[in-house]
Amino acid sequence: MALLQIAEPGQSAAPHQHRLAVGIDLGTTNSLVAAVRSGVTATLPDENGQHSLPSIVRYTQDGIEVGQVAALSSAQDPKNTIVSVKRFMGRSLTDIQSGEQIFPYQFEASENGLPLFVTPQGQVNPVQVSAEILRPLVERAEKTLGGELQGVVITVPAYFDDAQRQGTKDAASLLGVKVLRLLNEPTAAAIAYGLDSKQEGVIAIYDLGGGTFDISILRLNRGVFEVLATGGDSALGGDDFDHLLQAHMQQVWQLTNLDPQLSRQLLIEARRVKEALTDASEVEASLTLADGTVLKQVVTKAEFDNLISALVKKTIASCRRTLRDAGVTADEVLETVMVGGSTRVPLVREQVEAFFGKAPLTSIDPDRVVAIGAAIQADILVGNKPESELLLLDVIPLSLGIETMGGLVEKVVSRNTTIPVARAQEFTTFKDGQTAMAFHVVQGERELVDDCRSLARFTLKGIPPLAAGAAHIRVTFQVDADGLLSVTAMEKSTGVQSSIQVKPSFGLSDTEIATMLKDSMKHAKEDISRRMLAEQQVEAARVLESLNAALAKDGDLLTSDERQQIDAVMAKLAEIARGDDADAIKQAIEVLDEHTQDFAAKRMDNSIRVAFKGQSIDNI
């Protein structure tokens, strides 16, 4: 006899029932969905047994095609077939059109300058296109697992900025899917390998996908993944290999002024040749022209290696920089994990092995390893595993800070700090009676604001009109597990506050990060000198501002000679402060301080007299 189970409406009668959650690798070229079932993590195939879904969306008069069916039509209808949409996420139309690559799409700009694809279905943005890629993956998962998903973990490149990460979340939101977490792709790979092998030590994650390259150096210790440093390039991947081979084949065949359809056909053939060269020393390429002419040529592995050599070397240079940032050497790296379909290219594996001095790990399909790691994390976050089994510590690639008087940067969260993180610092007002304060949030390693990257600006109003330096404003920087930054400023006595969530409209490539880091080291000595000068100039301005206010109020306490002497020293300080000698400014401030000691004493005496005027000794 079966037991009757009774539960309150809306509550589960089986509190320990397995909750449904999946990991989604939303890739530039292909996307996958994976889940943990009966303790085994695996990618989920569609009804045709295909695990990967081409990240391609075609818009027609009759509807929307996604995946393989869209890919088959891409050569005939390139204008309405959107590929590698991940590259457009969070980027402005100006940024896209200023690049070297020419796209077959018709673009229009949104109100905030972001790209809109003009299609037979109307204007669509990259977020909407991404949602169309997610849709069949979510439907596949729910059909396979037999129920509605309670959440997903979606992977993103480590160098996706806030706008790109938010766009990825928004794509899921359009489908009504709850995003448990955005997970960096290299970190997802570390989860997939780290839990299986239970190793400890330094691990390198070399992730070369269709459109992005990421290198992460992680330390694995007792189940804790700590990302020591990250690097890479958000605009370098297997797509670039395809375009180089496409250009080579076009040159050999002496083809000029290709229409979009023939150009897409040539790109598809270049991709086929690239993949075939993984296991062959040479491959015959062919292309059928509109008039029926069939062109053929043989592409050798040596030719292909020569074409892509510079790009592969660029990834190795990123590895070298990131190791230096992590404070470790290649010899200390125990294992190198290969992620992304482009790591199947023999030259890539050869160069990685030569650099790290050992053969990379490839036991998990490099196309599926990220999705598998995301699924493991989703299973934990949805509550199917104790979270103590795994702890993730990602890092902030560049310092975050606030502009202070004089154009200086006060760093609040240092570079390579693990996230999620919250840091707070107190600031104060510069002028008497100041009731508002403007905040400028910046990113970078330099000492002056002009040399850093501007992220956002906001204003805190309602500060009590107190004397300069009397108000206390607490500024809190909070970076969540998805790398999104929130900045809050609060005046402590009143509780009045203002905040902003930073969503930059432009992406941040690893080239920009590398340049900013190199510039900070190159100009370190100069920057310190400039900072010291700016600090002294700010101090001089503060002293003069304060003294002018004091003279306006109590100047009649001075004799004519005393006033002239102070005015002369103040004028001298103002003149010196306009120069570039920090020591001279500091000395001039000290001289002014000496000349105003008597004035300060007179003000104190006068304040005491006023305070006690009319009071008897007994009351005192």
From Swiss-Prot:
User: What InterPro entries would the database entry show?
Assistant: ATPase_NBD, Heat_shock_70_CS, HSP70_C_sf, HSP70_peptide-bd_sf, Hsp_70_fam, ISC_FeS_clus_asmbl_HscA
SUPFAM superfamilies named in the record = Actin-like ATPase domain, Heat shock protein 70kD (HSP70), C-terminal subdomain, Heat shock protein 70kD (HSP70), peptide-binding domain
Gene Ontology BP terms: iron-sulfur cluster assembly
Which domain of life does the UniProt lineage start with? Bacteria
Annotated GO MF terms = ATP binding; ATP hydrolysis activity; ATP-dependent protein folding chaperone; unfolded protein binding
Which PROSITE patterns does UniProt cross-reference here?
HSP70_1, HSP70_2
Q: Which family does it belong to?
A: Belongs to the heat shock protein 70 family.
Which PANTHER family is this protein grouped with? HEAT SHOCK PROTEIN 70KDA
Function recorded in the entry: Chaperone involved in the maturation of iron-sulfur cluster-containing proteins. Has a low intrinsic ATPase activity which is markedly stimulated by HscB.
Question: By what name is this protein known?
Answer: Chaperone protein HscA homolog
